[in-house]
């Protein structure tokens, strides 16, 4: 559980999980997938969450603690709109059912097209 971030995790839970993240044995922050996989992973995640190049991030950190804290906060902020929408839908079963119906109809249309192409490709009559 500690290494898993759920979309439904609270911001404080996300930040706690990142604070417990395993880093590397030395104290320097640099990007090196082979020698420093823990720190490199945090830098990759922070890069995605903030849309900042890894090289620029690595230059800004000298301690693991600050890197972990900032990564947790950035991921929590990135996931907050999803978590908020989840909570809204959880409290409105009617809206959730409506959205599921719309999704099912779209999926059925895509699946029918794909199935028709597959039938034609193998020489079977279309449905």
PLM region descriptions:
Residues 1-127:
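Conserved nucleotide- and phosphate/pyrophosphate-binding catalytic cores
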């Amino acid at each position: 559980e500690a290494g898993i971030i759920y979309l439904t995790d609270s911001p404080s839970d996300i930040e706690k999980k990142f604070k417990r993240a395993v880093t590397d044995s030395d104290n320097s922050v640099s990007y090196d997938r082979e020698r420093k996989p823990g720190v490199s992973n945090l830098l990759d995640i922070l890069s995605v969450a903030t849309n900042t190049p890894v090289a620029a991030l690595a230059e800004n950190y000298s301690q693991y603690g600050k890197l972990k804290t900032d990564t947790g906060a950035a991921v929590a902020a990135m996931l907050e709109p999803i978590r908020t929408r989840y909570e809204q839908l959880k409290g409105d079963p009617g809206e959730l059912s409506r959205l599921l119906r719309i999704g099912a109809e779209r999926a059925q249309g895509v699946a029918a097209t794909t199935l028709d192409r597959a039938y034609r490709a193998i020489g079977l009559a279309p449905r």
